[in-house]
Swiss-Prot record:
GO terms for molecular function: GTP binding; GTPase activity; translation elongation factor activity. InterPro entries: EF-Tu_GTP-bd, EF-Tu_GTPase, EFTu-like_2, EFTU_2, G_TR_CS, P-loop_NTPase, Small_GTP-bd, T_Tr_GTP-bd_dom. Its EC number is 3.6.5.3. The gene is tuf. This is Elongation factor Tu. It is found in: Cytoplasm. It comes from Maridesulfovibrio salexigens (strain ATCC 14822 / DSM 2638 / NCIMB 8403 / VKM B-1763) (Desulfovibrio salexigens). CDD domains: EF_Tu, EFTU_II, EFTU_III. Residues 174-176 are annotated as: G5.
Amino acid sequence: MGKAKFERGKPHVNIGTIGHIDHGKTTLTAAITKIAGLAGNGDYVAFDEIDKAPEEKERGITIATAHVEYETEARHYAHVDCPGHADYIKNMITGAAQMDGAILVVAATDGPMPQTREHILLARQVGVPGIVVFLNKCDMVDDEELLELVEMEVRELLSSYDFPGDDLPVIQGSALKALECESADEDAAKPILDLLAACDSYIEEPERDIDKPFLMPIEDVFSISGRGTVVTGRVERGVIKVGEEVEIVGIRDTAKTTCTGVEMFRKLLDQGQAGDNVGVLLRGTKRDEVERGQVLSAPGSINPHTKFKAEVYVLSKDEGGRHTPFFSGYRPQFYFRTTDITGVVTLDEGVEMVMPGDNATFNVEMINPIAMDPGLRFAIREGGRTVGAGVVTEILE
């Protein structure tokens, strides 16, 4: 079968499988590509191909992730699946694979297990917006009441982590049986089609970066004689137009200025948008009033903060991280967007220390404020060497 051309006209949604080891995440991923393929919406990717996922580096951390894609009538999906539990944690914390929604796989034979909980908690912490449940291995449970009990248990667990457990879709099926299908009309294929329909209707289409308020991390500052000060960087979100007011946020007191020019590849433009590497000319701003590490943003859209809570993954020794644990009072650099800022870490009560390879909750107070919102990713460094990665989960001050 020739590779089907993907229609880029459909909305694009990033999704992934989460759940306990051996509950069937990878089998389900393969089954989705098979059934979608049989329905004429993509190419089948076999279990073994997904399972031997290549390793990628994100913020200096090695993560094994498999990427597959498929379509429904309504959407184009990019789907991530990780072979190992540690890969999931790293993936969710670093945001290596951004998830607009997740498929939580729970084996009906086991019910929710420790990693089920951990993945739900992480999804909540890192802000995965929606979860759809696939209750797998239902062919191995004869008792209808038992299936109902497991479903109830999963719903209650999701509710306890502030997901709408009573309302979200739970699909019962068998990924293995679906993999044996030769046609999308077979009974065993129906749960997979139902799951895709549930993803279409329940997982919300993400707001496109270009529709969000303007933000550009400042990478460099130049002064151009007779014209003023130019800041350069890659526009993270939104659009900047000539003549618009912007704020310079972070490190120092927030300052207001006006964009008097946008240029890209030495050409003058009337606007810059998400994804563009641009130079922005600022009216009346002096070269020494702005620095790398600050951001240029739409007025009032983002504020500077010094105290926050974060979920962090600490690199193991094998990953080039620390060789020894650290304790409350640890003072590394936090690398946000384009710059390092020193901060002091306080661990949660009852947590004595954090070992290399652990994930933990940090309470951080930084010496300078940084423009931040929950969901912002950062690296933790010691003398320029990455020793961890994290995501802001809550602003404290």
